[in-house]
């Protein structure tokens, strides 16, 4: 919600917010399609809330068709959705291979499908921006086993695959105006992790920090120098002073 709302503050508001499905446990996640749409419209912009299932490719096709039918173009694609189903916190010998396959499909294969649907239109218009949400689970080993302050193999492996996409887009299409980034939000304080040891190890920032960073990446010419790289949203937000009042002065 914070990413969509902040991006609409900077741009023209043509965002389709997503949702997170968690098949392994019931969690309360702040925000919804309705509240995100309301936050956008409160800023005087239009919103088009569309439900989409990362495991259901036809629903992805339908979402893109609806957005293009309503507005005719997509200038920026922010892949912020994640699939957090069964197996994401399983250890190596406990990970069911069918669950691992779903994680890879939801967090890599079908998000690649979405990119393949959207980027050709960007190329026809001379360019566009793609922001892929990364994760520390894709770039580092856990500090401890899952359930003891670390994370499982399945989720990290699926995010590691997706991490390769932005750099590949940059290599293949930067000369044609495609500006692609990976963004690592760091630990975000509204994540409410069930693993208390994990929460103790990582201090977080509010989601508005990553929202401000992504809005800047999608709109600023200065951001082009970061294309093809992994951008850490919290240091970027602090360095560029993108969110007034953050970090708070002690």
Kindly label every feature range from the protein language model.
Residues 1-71, 85-91, 95, 249:
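Short-chain dehydrogenase/reductase
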Residues 83-85, 94-98, 129-175, 187:
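Catalytic loop of short-chain dehydrogenase/reductase
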